[in-house]
Amino acid sequence: MTSDTIRQTLDELLLDKNGGSSNEARAFFLSQIIDQLKLISSQTDAERQLQKLQLKDPNDNIVKATPPPPPPPPPLISILQQAPPPPPPPPPPTLKAPPPPPILGLKTPSKSLKTPTPRPKECPTSFLPKKEKKTKTRTVQWSKINASVVQDDSVWGKLAKASNVDIDFDLLDNFFGIESLAVSGAAEVVKKSTRKDAHVELLTAKRSQNVAIMLKQFKNIDELIDDVSQNKPVAEIDALQNLFGMLPQSEEEEALRRYTGDISLLSPPSSFFYRLVQIQFYRLRIETQIFLSDFSRLMRELAPNVEILIRTSQEILTSPTLPRLLLIFVNMGNYLNGNNSQGNAFGFTLNSLWKLIDLKGNKQEFSLLHLLVTCEPDLVAHLQEELSTLKDASQISFDEIKISLKTLRDGRCKLEKQLETCSGASFTQFLELIKIDCKFELDEFGANYDKLTELQYQLADYFCENRNTFQLDECLKIFNFLMNRLQQTLKEHVTRETRKLKKEEKKETQTTRECEKTMKKPEKIDLFDALTASNGGPESPRKRAAGILDMRQKLGNVRIRKLRDVTTLESSFTPPPPPPLESPTDSTSSKENESVKPAKTSTNYEMCNDLESYITSLTRKRASHLPKAPPKEEPKLPEVLPEKSKIALKIEKIPEKIDKPPLPQAAPIIPKLPQKSIKAPSTVTTRSKVPPPTAAAAVRIVSVTTTTTPTKTAELRKPGARSPKTTVATVPKVTVVPVSRVPVAPSTPLSRRMSAPVVRKPTMTAEKKREITMKPSVSTSARPSLINTSSHPMVRSPLPKMSVLEKPKPLRITRPTVIPQSPTVTSSARPSGLRQPAKPKWV
């Protein structure tokens, strides 16, 4: 029984006189269901049709009919039994639940109506608000009653006829509002408030998610659909390749084509595929655009690579230096393999170059390439010039070119056949590009490829390799590696030779310097011979002494004026005449000094000094304007004292023993001598009280110190220099003490003294000494009493530091006091002018 027969039979049964309007409603619903049966081919279609026929409230809840469904009428069953039972239509394979239950559910509400009042189709005006909603508010969770259930005698039927109600909707917005909404119709407001995501999904969840991620790669989906439909090139070619791998499958494509609902209800992935499926031959259009894009890109890459390989192969075949290199390798290998079966070789394979390159000698840093570079240093430069494109060609894969060419040829032929089968003017442009342009470029590229293949065979024959196993890529990589190692070895060789030359030059330079030093080294001359030889020559003062000469002369002039004053005072004594002033250096005359000239100073003589030479010349100039002393003989020791005593003839004779009355002045200054060695002073004087001179002898008395040694002038020093300590005290009376031979301490030579001024230390006053807290100079561990525990500053103790086991030593030994003796003591007598030291003070 067909669907039309079933509809006609149902119409006859339902449109009877007893059924009334309820039967008409049943017939209407049944006709809709029968019409939809043609569109149901899968479970998804059945579920979709079921959702359309179900009655739902605003919250998507199914409205169940209150009265139970009545049993079917018996006349319908009897008629169906009398009719011959037709074969039942085959159910859909994927349909699990048949649609009759919802059909019966839809019948029950119409049968449960007791009154024949017509069902209101629209909501009564009394129930609708008088103001459009502009604010998003909270929703009311209730169960909505359908208009078909409402009866006239019910409360909702009576309220539908009631008058309008005045409600303050602004107050509702204030209390229940969330956010404002765009002004739209009442139907849209109800639709938005019922459900947020009311999308129909024709794909699985995972499939829909992957498609949504892929669509984000396109800037504009609508523009993409237009470009595909009009055969325009797509800018996002990479995204188009991803899209080609995710196109709808056959089942998905069939479901998309059967969809007749609203497109706006579909999800974005389903909507995109739905629009794409509507384009005729959409898959072929996308595939053609991808092929054309890949074809142009591969041609731009492969064509230059093939040309480089052709050029490099020709350079290897025509290079004259490469056979020379192989000849050197063969000779070296046959020499090294002369005692085994590997010798006397006619050649070697290209793979053997890997082992020849890494062949090391008895030293790890020396290889076979080092020897080759040493023998033929220009070989590397010639090879680099002849094989200029070898480095670029070694990075190209010949197998990839072969595979790409085969792929392009197969793809072009396949698309050409597909486009020819598709009728229509829309594919004319694609067909011309594939059939004419692409074929021409492939033919030209194939000719170059065939030429490269022929060169590969020539190289195999050139190096005596097998054509079937010879690979152009491997050959180019071997020669490129050989070139790199040769360049590296050449750099090492040049660096080694440069270092060797620098080392030899440095050695020659050192040898030359040593020879020059030996030639310039003067002979060692005796100092006495040098001084004797330089007596008659002119003086050669140094530049350093010339600067000091002016200051020394100024200082010398001041000191000389003082000496002249002294000589004038000494000359005032009438009896006897004063002794003549002697020269500062020696008692000899100036003529004798002029005759003897000092030796010139030089760095070769260790005992010579520039300052000594300068002082000698300075004293010679001073002695030139002084009165010359008559030559005198050296006085004998016993006669020295009587001659010196003639100086004080006019002075009263000094008694041998002098009574020293107590002096109000301070004690005499006694110089301290170092302990353990007492040396006799060069000048011995005594301080004595002399009565005031008379009027007759009212002359100025100049103190003259008499010694057995020749007199010397004062040393010349710079202003501010510290004068040496002297023990000579000037007194109104000269006391001459006859002293036996006393060893005179020689004065420090001028050559050992510093010419720089002595820096004076600031003197410490007594008040400053009191303020400074001094540490005890004695060990406080041995003497606890010395520890200062008071707040008063401690005075520096004169006691020396002592250890616990050390024996006490005398703190000070008194200086020997000189006792005047009579001048009649002979030189052979024992010196008795020294008083024994007093007892030492013990700790």
Curated annotation (Swiss-Prot):
<dbReference type="GO" id="GO:1904531">
    <property type="term" value="P:positive regulation of actin filament binding"/>
</dbReference>
<keyword id="KW-0963">Cytoplasm</keyword>
<dbReference type="GO" id="GO:0005874">
    <property type="term" value="C:microtubule"/>
</dbReference>
<dbReference type="GO" id="GO:0060562">
    <property type="term" value="P:epithelial tube morphogenesis"/>
</dbReference>
<dbReference type="GO" id="GO:0003779">
    <property type="term" value="F:actin binding"/>
</dbReference>
<feature type="compositionally biased region" description="Pro residues">
    <location>
        <begin position="83"/>
        <end position="103"/>
    </location>
</feature>
<dbReference type="GO" id="GO:0005884">
    <property type="term" value="C:actin filament"/>
</dbReference>
<dbReference type="InterPro" id="IPR042201">
    <property type="entry name" value="FH2_Formin_sf"/>
</dbReference>
<keyword id="KW-0206">Cytoskeleton</keyword>
<feature type="compositionally biased region" description="Polar residues">
    <location>
        <begin position="819"/>
        <end position="830"/>
    </location>
</feature>
<keyword id="KW-0493">Microtubule</keyword>
<keyword id="KW-0009">Actin-binding</keyword>
<comment type="function">
    <text>Constitutively active protein required for microtubule and F-actin growth, structural maintenance and organization during excretory cell tubulogenesis.</text>
</comment>
<comment type="similarity">
    <text>Belongs to the formin homology family.</text>
</comment>
<dbReference type="GO" id="GO:0002064">
    <property type="term" value="P:epithelial cell development"/>
</dbReference>
<protein>
    <recommendedName>
        <fullName>Excretory canal abnormal protein 6</fullName>
    </recommendedName>
</protein>
<dbReference type="GO" id="GO:0035150">
    <property type="term" value="P:regulation of tube size"/>
</dbReference>
<dbReference type="GO" id="GO:0005737">
    <property type="term" value="C:cytoplasm"/>
</dbReference>
<dbReference type="GO" id="GO:0031941">
    <property type="term" value="C:filamentous actin"/>
</dbReference>
<feature type="region of interest" description="Disordered">
    <location>
        <begin position="54"/>
        <end position="135"/>
    </location>
</feature>
<dbReference type="GO" id="GO:0030041">
    <property type="term" value="P:actin filament polymerization"/>
</dbReference>
<feature type="domain" description="FH2">
    <location>
        <begin position="127"/>
        <end position="512"/>
    </location>
</feature>
<feature type="region of interest" description="Disordered">
    <location>
        <begin position="773"/>
        <end position="843"/>
    </location>
</feature>
<dbReference type="GO" id="GO:0031113">
    <property type="term" value="P:regulation of microtubule polymerization"/>
</dbReference>
<feature type="region of interest" description="Disordered">
    <location>
        <begin position="748"/>
        <end position="767"/>
    </location>
</feature>
<feature type="compositionally biased region" description="Polar residues">
    <location>
        <begin position="776"/>
        <end position="792"/>
    </location>
</feature>
<dbReference type="Pfam" id="PF02181">
    <property type="entry name" value="FH2"/>
</dbReference>
<feature type="region of interest" description="Disordered">
    <location>
        <begin position="568"/>
        <end position="601"/>
    </location>
</feature>
<feature type="compositionally biased region" description="Pro residues">
    <location>
        <begin position="66"/>
        <end position="76"/>
    </location>
</feature>
<dbReference type="InterPro" id="IPR015425">
    <property type="entry name" value="FH2_Formin"/>
</dbReference>
